[in-house]
Amino acid sequence: MAPSALPERSEPVTRAELEAFKLDRLRGLLRDVLPQNAFCAAKLSRVAADRLASLDDLAEWPFTFKEELVAAASNGLPGNLTWPPERYVRFHQTSGTHGRPLPVFDTRDDWAWWMECWRVILDRGGVTPDDRVLVASSFGPYAGFWSGFEAVIDRGGLAISAGGMPSLGRLQLARSLAATVLMATPSYALHLAEVAEEHKIDLAALPVRLVIVMGEPGGSIP
């Protein structure tokens, strides 16, 4: 089995080492997925995915679009499952802002991957066990906020659920609990700022030092 991460060492990883690691991991993933996943097998049937020679070969691979995944889903199940349904332990779905929501099933290993991704995000933001993180979400089936909330708990910080609260209530909760980090979508973070202005709440006086945004393209724009 291919290693799940590059070995830790003091000197930087070279580009060649990184690409070799990625290729090895991808080959292992394909060996597991293609025999079990009819959607992926059909999608990659014309590119000899089982004979991937280099990462450059990926330039010839077809894109997979969200519309295809939504169309393949039926009876609440994704159309691209690799394992039997009983192996999955978590259900989430996309927000449905643009069309029908896309169901997402995760195994325990999948969820561990989510947590590893969030570990990197929290590291980059300098989030520590001393932080108090207000998660401004309705806590419906949207995966992003559930994963972020659990990652804060794993970090040892205080994860503050603000589900089911009006925007003003969330601002008041952030103030009363001295939240140091806000987690929200970009558009909702801007909406909170507008509500604060309407109710004459001085955002600069709040202890929030970091805003982590997700779920919309704005989160990737510096």
Enumerate the language-model features and the residues they cover.
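Conserved AMP-binding loop of ANL adenylate-forming enzymes
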Residues: D123-R155
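Short, flexible loop segments at the rims of nucleotide/cofactor-binding pockets, characterized by
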Residues: D110-W111, S137, L158-A162
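Short glycine-enriched loops at secondary-structure junctions
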Residues: Y88, W111, S138-P141, S187
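Residue-level signal for inorganic ion chemistry
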Residues: V33, T94, V133, L182
